[in-house]
Amino acid sequence: MKPEDMCLVDFEGNQLCGTKKRTSEILMHLQIMQRQPNALASVHCHPPYATGFAVAGVEPPTCMVPEYEVFASVAIAPYRTPGTPEMGKLVSDLVDKHNVILMANHGVVAWSHNNVEDAYFKMEILEAYCRTILVASQLGKPVGTMTPTQLQDLLKIKQSLGIPDPRYGLRECELCDNAEWRPGVTCQVPGAAASAGVVDPEVESVVQAITDQIMGQLG
């Protein structure tokens, strides 16, 4: 990117200078800044792992990696046509309590109260975290999580940095609610007997014994 590639726009979206046309999604960036007065910069892109979560409609789980807990607070905005005011509104409705928004079937946008580099940093943290979660969930082992007390320590740091998070003030029993992630994901291929519909004789014998006992009691 060169200096002449930069565009300057006002808060109405009118381009004031720059040789190239402004992005069609400038309205979303402006709506974020209008809704969140602390937002000095915002970044929008389509990182593959984070966008995968957005397409699946899955918010990344919490209580797993400190950097993600301290620097990011993620929510999902429903899909609307890119570049429309409707899309910008759905995203900006979430920026009071979140600084990174997954855009369903689209991508990700992040804002910062510091500068554009910091907004990009938050985007990078989310992308690395989503990739880590996908790898961990495929190892066939329970995914380790922090305790609520450990998370509270991180939230105190986060709050001191002025980063929004909807979990401030929650009780410990309301934190780290990731039950669907804790067991991990085990990918197993059915054996030949299972695919052929063959029943284990020992299991069949136990089932038959229980059935006979129940029928005897009913008689």
Task: Identify the residue ranges that each predicted region occupies.
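Glycine-rich flexible loops
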Residues: M1-L218
